[in-house]
């Protein structure tokens, strides 16, 4: 859980930094990819173990595509109950559904449920953090078969930016011993999201 929190903190800090600097979109994503590789290269934060860590050079990514950065309509769902998020292990973290994002991508009308971790929201560093676990038609082919994750910030208005170029694999893709959230059926996207982190030969 500690390493996962560090990864989330990196992603939040990264988003804040890029908002302060005038980077091109491609530079923004390249910096995100670089920092994610740094995270995986650091023995203190990497989910990789043993030989996998020693052999690690960099994560593979889809080509950067602005098409996969979408501005979605955002509906808050304030009356949703707290629930135990199913995971791949014994851990059952508490979440609420914070809202629903609706958008068009690859000529399809799609939607994603967005969640808030009840423990993290009590920490000032993560108070505005939102989480999307999702599946798409690349699972088991070019991406991890158990889905990918996105981290976002609570928006101020009724839209939210979802950038699939920042989609990443759960730690379970790289090592045993983690309890990773399982994307709900509602977040199965009926399209191929050819963006974000690839999954080949464990890296």
Predicted regions and their residues:
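Mid-length scaffold segments of soluble, non-membrane domains
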Residues: 78-145
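Short acidic/polar mixed-charge low-complexity motifs
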Residues: 66, 106-110, 158
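Start-of-domain marker
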Residues: 20-79
